[in-house]
Regions:
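NTP-dependent nucleotidyl-transfer catalytic core
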Residues: 1-234
Length: 234
């Protein structure tokens, strides 16, 4: 159809489609940990163009943005904002695996908290950290969660909302509108056996998954994938 449209610009105007379908297109879906970049803009234009073509052919199209708001990267976002908010590191010493963009400082300045941190508390927070960059940020995340749970929750929620609002505004200016913003957190936790993600996992494990080396693997190679994929790591 694209070849026909390329050769004849009026192709879609004259095309009649008798097999109309409901089609969902999930695109952009950048992690809500910072502003969109040019690559995301390209994906937005591409996905929206596909949606418009399918709509012109008579299909019912739903555009979805999948918001990964439940992963480790969101913890790193919250940790980065916390460290900036309370000036735990100098500019040159800021953790390598933390987010360092100017937007982190903007969020830190914008959020209002009813707690403060003393100099000795800051020193304790950043004392004796691992040398490995990933272990260092994970240790900071764990310490902040344990010692400042209320501030952590407020910063995490505020930072996530701030970034998502910025993404929405940029996409609106780009004239790309999504029918649905699906939040990964709505699936619940694996620790909750009644959650949607636990129910889905149980169905998959019944017929299309297996355990190996302490991890749960999806038999995706049976469905055209080049290899099986890990669902739950050990």
């Amino acid at each position: 159809q694209l070849d026909n449209a390329h050769n004849d610009p009026s192709y879609f105007l004259n095309s009649s489609n008798t097999s109309k379908e409901k089609i969902q297109i999930e695109f952009v879906s950048a992690n809500p940990t910072g502003p969109l970049h040019v690559g995301h803009g390209r994906g937005a234009a591409y996905g929206d163009a596909i949606g418009r073509i399918l709509e012109r052919l008579g299909h019912e199209v739903s555009r979805e943005y999948y918001v990964n708001d439940a992963g480790r990267q969101i913890d790193i976002l919250a940790c980065s904002i916390f460290l900036r908010k309370f000036k735990c590191f100098s500019k040159n010493e800021f953790p390598e695996s933390a987010y360092k963009g100017s937007y982190i400082s903007e969020i830190a300045d914008a959020i209002e908290l009813d707690i403060g941190i003393t100099k000795s508390e800051k020193e304790s927070l950043i004392d004796n950290l691992p040398n490995d960059n990933e272990e260092r940020i994970d240790t900071l995340i764990e310490r902040i969660k344990i010692n400042y749970p209320k501030a952590w929750s407020s910063i995490r929620d505020f930072g996530l909302s701030y970034v998502i609002r910025s993404i929405r505004e940029d996409l609106t200016k780009f004239k790309v509108i999504f029918n649905n913003w699906f939040f990964e957190s709505s699936l619940g936790e694996l620790s909750d056996k009644k959650s949607e993600i636990s129910k889905a996992l149980a169905k998959v494990q019944k017929d299309h998954a297996y355990e190996k080396n302490g991890a749960i693997w999806l038999e995706s190679s049976k469905f055209g994938d080049d290899k099986d994929r890990v669902i739950i790591r050990e």
